Structures are given as structure tokens and as C-alpha cells.
Amino acid sequence: GDPTFCGETCRVIPVCTYSAALGCTCDDRSDGLCKRN
């Protein structure tokens, strides 16, 4: 289904910090939100 928003944004720096440990990556195509597929 759709990627899950991880509650972290990555607009300023395109890197997810704390949610990266949860398997989340920066989806720069959708307002810079960290998402997990």
C-alpha cells in the first residue's frame, strides 16, 4: 500500500535522523517527509 509517514520531516536536510533506525527514508517528492515502505 502507501508508505507510512514516520513523524519526521526532512525538508531542510534531506536525511531522516531518529526515524532512520526504524527503516524510514526521506521522500523528497512529497514535501520532504520521512516514510517507510
Curated annotation (Swiss-Prot):
Transmembrane segments: none annotated. One of its GO terms (biological process) is defense response. Disulfide bonds join 6-24, 10-26, 16-34. It comes from the Eukaryota. Signal peptide: none annotated. This is a cyclic peptide. There is a cross-link at residues 1-37 (Cyclopeptide (Gly-Asn)). Keywords: Disulfide bond, Knottin, Plant defense. SUPFAM superfamilies: Cyclotides. InterPro entries: Cyclotide, Cyclotide_sf. Coiled coil: none annotated. Probably participates in a plant defense mechanism. Inhibits the cytopathic effects of the human immunodeficiency virus. Belongs to the cyclotide family. The presence of a 'disulfide through disulfide knot' structurally defines this protein as a knottin. This is Palicourein. It comes from Palicourea condensata.
